[in-house]
Amino acid sequence: MGLPWYRVHTVVLNDPGRLLAVHIMHTALVAGWAGSMALYELAVFDPSDPVLDPMWRQGMFVIPFMTRLGITNSWGGWSITGGTVTNPGIWSYEGVAGSHILFSGLCFLAAIWHWVYWDLAIFSDERTGKPSLDLPKIFGIHLFLSGLACFGFGAFHVTGLYGPGIWVSDPYGLTGEVQPVNPAWGVEGFDPFVPGGIASHHIAAGTLGILAGLFHLSVRPPQRLYKGLRMGNIETVLSSSIAAVFFAAFVVAGTMWYGSATTPIELFGPTRYQWDQGYFQQEIYRRVGAGLAKNQSLSEAWSKIPEKLAFYDYIGNNPAKGGLFRAGSMDSGDGIAVGWLGHPIFRDKEGRELFVRRMPTFFETFPVVLVDGDGIVRADVPFRRAESKYSVEQVGVTIEFYGGELNGVSYSDPATVKKYARRAQLGEIFELDRATLKSDGVFRSSPRGWFTFGHASFALLFFFGHIWHGARTLFRDVFAGIDPDLDTQVEFGAFQKLGDPTTRRQAV
């Protein structure tokens, strides 16, 4: 059977045993990849600095997903929060990786068994003796089992009743830890940033799935609906399954890109909107203002800002700054962050405090402009010196650092002031090590960006696949060329055009 590459899956179209085999093999490949990728990431991951070199800066992709489900310790003796552990137990990062690889191997063997022993009695129709599947019944079984798993995850794992809970943090990603979560049954449960909604929605959706599964197991579909939706055709299953997958892919692409309780910034990095809206900058200024209100000096107030919070307020951690084909981690772009230099405050010779206008997300270069508290431009780094009116030299801009490594240090040298003004465009100023990884200085995206791009792309492809296979199963008779109302028996090969007696082939 000379099938083109895009039609090879027809070999399992009417072969339930081998259809099952290839799906088990697919599960083996998925689980095997997950386990292998986890081991690779653990081999290259450096857990020594969870504040300035967290998992998302290092380009970890599967470690954040394990962590948000409650895994925090390694058999290597380290914890994701920076401490050391003596008894991590079986469910460490390595334990999860190993269990996936073990499961993959078992699925591999099961796939081979089902490929060899394909002609099982369970796949045979008692009335006709031909291979067939009771698809509505199978749908009910799968719905019931997935509902059970969904309910169990929400009621036991997330709540901590039998399980660790999930990763929960504050709005600024500073105090995250794994903890049990109580279900949120009120209107607050619909807030995507409330962790309690994860528990309540899994419990509710799981209950619905269990009830719907029992319904489909006990009630047969009406004949008209069965025929109308082509429920006897395996391609209907393919089409509707693809629909479920692409819908889920669109949803998770959204929750990842825009942020939610399921995608904590400590594990996946901040969102681009937090940079666009000055989210962390506002919180930093609020904290400094609160410190000043308590009669602290500027230096004391800025010194109390957590380095972790300051690091979020840096454009290099914005996932939208990475280019489409810039492979690699954030660390291999602008370098490994070593320390916060402190917050620079610029002043002109009249003593006015000046603020550097920050670079918008989608700019690679941006003019250095310093404005006062009223938004009036007071200084800049001009493109043409001959025409300049507001140059650092003319205005007499000075800089002083508060907090961080340069706390209390001031500069009046124009070249130094301009250097730090350029860096202040990018948010808080950090010392970055570009030598260790030979970082090229070009921004990279975080796993948040990769996940979103991958899932949005595949969702679009799968949407097309749903339309394609849905059309094929609904209009199969039209595409085959056979009149559905044809009463006479059709002999394949007897006519040039299938089912058309006027095009009977001539005997040679």
From Swiss-Prot:
SUPFAM superfamilies: Photosystem II antenna protein-like
Subcellular location: Plastid, Chloroplast thylakoid membrane
Stored InterPro entries: PS_antenna-like (IPR000932), PS_II_antenna-like_sf (IPR036001), PSII_PsbB (IPR017486)
Nucleotide-binding keyword on record: no
Membrane topology term: Multi-pass membrane protein
Cofactor binding annotation: Binds multiple chlorophylls. PSII binds additional chlorophylls, carotenoids and specific lipids.
Keywords in alphabetical order: Chlorophyll, Chloroplast, Chromophore, Membrane, Photosynthesis, Photosystem II, Plastid, Thylakoid, Transmembrane, Transmembrane helix
Primary role: One of the components of the core complex of photosystem II (PSII). It binds chlorophyll and helps catalyze the primary light-induced photochemical processes of PSII. PSII is a light-driven water:plastoquinone oxidoreductase, using light energy to abstract electrons from H(2)O, generating O(2) and a proton gradient subsequently used for ATP formation.
This protein's name: Photosystem II CP47 reaction center protein
Organism: Oenothera biennis (German evening primrose)
